[in-house]
């Protein structure tokens, strides 16, 4: 076409065959059909719109184009939301604590069946803050492991000041959920281990529970704080040979024989040679540890003195691991004398130690100064035949000797001496643990903001034991302890306890129960904020009403004063008029009122000026506006 004259630079333009306005192609574009091509020269050249204008024209002229574009945008948006939710849901972790909070109605129903009451805020506090500090392996997000729950329950039910009575309903409810799990707990409960056959050989004691939570996908990874104090290591009971402290033979000792291939401990012993001295009680003890216990023996082998199968008492001294654990897992005597005294008391009652064992126990758990103080107080507690403390040196040395006595624990007399010695030693520990009387220390013990009344009472009793010579458990001191409990409780609890009816007849237990009810009914921080806001609004409304009433009273008083002033002015003017008329002299019947001469009246008085009469002046009255 370029050879045709006059057609250089010509282009093809598509025009529809018909000029009908409703005929369009896809998305509103004009259709290109055969037979519709027109050759146009330079003069008739028509400029086409750019692609952007073409797209806008398609959007404005076609409903199908708008529908397709909206569908594409909506699909992209849905796909983005789906990918975002799938990624976030994959990172969510379900924990026992969150599981119980999601099903809190079932938790409350379980607690109601156990006749206890639980609250969600304290449930979260105990699970995430209190129970992890017991060092029994409880994670901050909770667990359904029955072993760990049992360990926490033992801590909660501990007698004395170390127990937590306020946490009893919560751990009991948690244990009930783990033992009899609802349907929403069963997938997370640890399966019970299969029953195994009884071992043929005596097994080692179980390892203590670890302080770290079990490795499971149910528990998130917990990071330990940077400044955590390392726990003292608990040594297991050593099964190796011990040194015979009772024998007088110096080391070296004979080496034990090589162990047998079958692992039987009896073959590892070395038979005594002929002419060798009789084995000491320690050697008998070492042999007895490798032998199975006697069938008819019901006492623990951990006791220093235990009754053997032949009716003779056998001596089992303390192991080094026991002494190490007692020393490193308990506070010092100066720091907490009550706790260490309770430990030594339990050891004295259960292990039945001899005089040497008592000295070893005191030397391990007490310092030199503390030991001397305990021994001095114990010797002061020795009583004579009349039941009073004695000062006779012979009686004191017989009952509580400072040097090793010749008490034979195989005889009844020797065992009686040991029992009396342990009682005196326990009395010395209790007396030495008391600080000088300081009632200010007792008065300084106050209830914390979130401390339960039971825990506060235990701290108060401990202060009485430590800083006063009185025993808080004595019925004669119950009134003093009760008054201190009321006055030193939290302000809200103390005010309500003081308003109790017949307060004098209430026992200390009744006061603690009432305080527990008040403590459990305390308002939450949200309720407290709502109450403060409501009281503030009521106070503002009351203040505004008082201001309005005061303004009305002020206006009424001002109006009353102005009325009194107006009445006073008017009455004064009236009195002036009446008084002026009375002061005029009385005239005779023929006397002039104007010139006071007789013979004519005032209207005929020649001295009175004649002329038009002016207007009579009007009396002016004061109004409130003036």
Curated annotation (Swiss-Prot):
Region (Disordered): 198-306, 522-626
Spans within the Cytoplasmic topological domain: 1-66
Ranges that cross the membrane: 67-86
Localization of this protein: Host cell membrane
ZnF endpoints (CCHC-type): 590-607
Gene3D superfamilies documented for this protein: Gamma-retroviral matrix domain (1.10.150.180), Human Immunodeficiency Virus Type 1 Capsid Protein (1.10.375.10), Zinc finger, CCHC-type (4.10.60.10)
Coiled-coil regions, chain positions: 526-566
Any one GO MF annotation of this record: zinc ion binding
Function: Plays a role in viral particle release. Presumably acts by facilitating the fission of the virion bud at the cell surface. May prevent the antiviral activity of murine APOBEC3.
GO biological process, one term: virion assembly
Modification note: Glycosylated by host.
Extracellular side: 87-626
Annotated glycosylation sites: 113
Basic and acidic residues bias spans: 522-554, 574-607
Record keywords: Coiled coil, Glycoprotein, Host cell membrane, Host membrane, Membrane, Metal-binding, Transmembrane, Transmembrane helix, Zinc, Zinc-finger
Superkingdom field: Viruses
Biased composition (Pro residues): 198-212, 249-261
SUPFAM superfamilies: Retroviral matrix proteins, Retrovirus capsid protein, N-terminal core domain, Retrovirus zinc finger-like domains
Disulphide-bridged cysteine pairs: none
Organism this protein belongs to: Friend murine leukemia virus (isolate FB29) (FrMLV)
Record-given protein name: Glyco-Gag protein
InterPro entries cross-referenced by the UniProt entry: G_retro_matrix, G_retro_matrix_sf, Gag_p12, Gag_P30, Retrov_capsid_N, Retroviral_Gag-Pol_poly, Retrovr_matrix, Znf_CCHC
């Amino acid at each position: 076409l370029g050879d045709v004259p006059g057609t250089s630079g010509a282009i093809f333009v598509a025009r529809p065959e018909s000029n009908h306005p409703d005929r369009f192609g896809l998305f509103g574009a004009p259709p290109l059909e055969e037979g519709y091509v027109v050759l146009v020269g330079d003069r008739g050249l028509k400029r086409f719109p750019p692609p952007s204008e073409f797209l806008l024209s398609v959007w404005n002229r076609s409903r199908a184009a708008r529908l397709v574009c909206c569908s594409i945008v909506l699909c992209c948006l849905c796909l983005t939301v789906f990918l975002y939710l799938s990624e976030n849901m994959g990172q969510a972790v379900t924990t026992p604590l969150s599981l119980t909070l999601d099903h809190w109605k079932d938790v409350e129903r379980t607690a109601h069946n156990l006749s206890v009451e639980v609250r969600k805020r304290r449930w979260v506090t105990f699970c995430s803050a209190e129970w992890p500090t017991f060092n029994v392996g409880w994670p901050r997000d909770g667990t359904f492991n029955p072993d760990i729950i049992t360990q926490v329950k033992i801590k909660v039910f501990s007698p004395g000041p170390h127990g937590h009575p306020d946490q009893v309903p919560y751990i009991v409810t948690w244990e009930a959920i783990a033992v009899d799990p609802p349907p929403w707990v069963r997938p997370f409960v640890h399966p019970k281990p299969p029953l195994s056959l009884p071992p043929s050989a005596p097994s080692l004691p179980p390892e203590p529970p670890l302080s770290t939570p079990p490795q499971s996908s149910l528990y998130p990874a917990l990071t330990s704080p940077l400044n955590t104090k390392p726990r003292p290591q608990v040594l297991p009971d050593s099964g190796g040979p011990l040194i015979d402290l009772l024998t007088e033979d110096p080391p070296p000792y004979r080496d034990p024989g090589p162990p047998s291939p079958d692992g039987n401990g009896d073959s590892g012993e070395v038979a005594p040679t002929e002419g060798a001295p009789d084995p000491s009680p320690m050697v008998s003890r070492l042999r007895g540890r490798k032998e199975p216990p006697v069938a008819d023996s019901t006492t623990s082998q951990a006791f220093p003195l235990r009754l053997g199968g032949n009716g003779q008492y056998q001596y089992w001294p303390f192991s080094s691991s026991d002494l190490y654990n007692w020393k490193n897992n308990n506070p010092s005597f100066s720091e907490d004398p009550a706790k260490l005294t309770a430990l030594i008391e339990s050891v004295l009652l259960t292990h039945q130690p001899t005089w040497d064992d008592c000295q070893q126990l005191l030397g391990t758990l007490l310092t030199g100064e503390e030991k001397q103080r305990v021994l001095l107080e114990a010797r002061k507690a020795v009583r004579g035949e009349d039941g009073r403390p004695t000062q006779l040196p012979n009686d004191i040395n017989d009952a509580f000797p400072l040097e090793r006595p010749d008490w034979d624990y195989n005889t009844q007399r020797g065992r009686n001496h040991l029992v009396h010695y342990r009682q005196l030693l326990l009395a010395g520990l209790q007396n030495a643990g008391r600080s000088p009387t300081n009632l200010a220390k007792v008065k300084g013990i106050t209830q914390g903001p979130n401390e339960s009344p039971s825990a506060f009472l235990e701290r108060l009793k401990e202060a009485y034991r430590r800083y006063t010579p009185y025993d808080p458990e004595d019925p004669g001191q119950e009134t003093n302890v009760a008054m201190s409990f009321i006055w030193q409780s939290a302000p809200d609890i103390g005010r309500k306890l003081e308003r109790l009816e017949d307060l004098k007849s209430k026992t200390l237990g009744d006061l603690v129960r009432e305080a527990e009810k008040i403590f459990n009914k305390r308002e939450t921080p949200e309720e407290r904020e709502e109450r403060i806001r409501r009281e503030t609004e009521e106070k503002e409304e009351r203040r505004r009403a008082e201001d309005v009433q005061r303004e009305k009273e002020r206006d009424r008083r001002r109006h009353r004063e102005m009325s009194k002033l107006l009445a006073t002015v008017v009455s004064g003017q009236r009195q002036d008029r009446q008084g002026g008329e009375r002061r005029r002299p009385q005239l005779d019947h023929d006397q002039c009122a104007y010139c006071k001469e007789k013979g004519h009246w005032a209207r005929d008085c020649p001295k009175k000026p004649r002329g038009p009469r002016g207007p009579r002046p009007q009396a002016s009255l004061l109004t409130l506006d003036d």
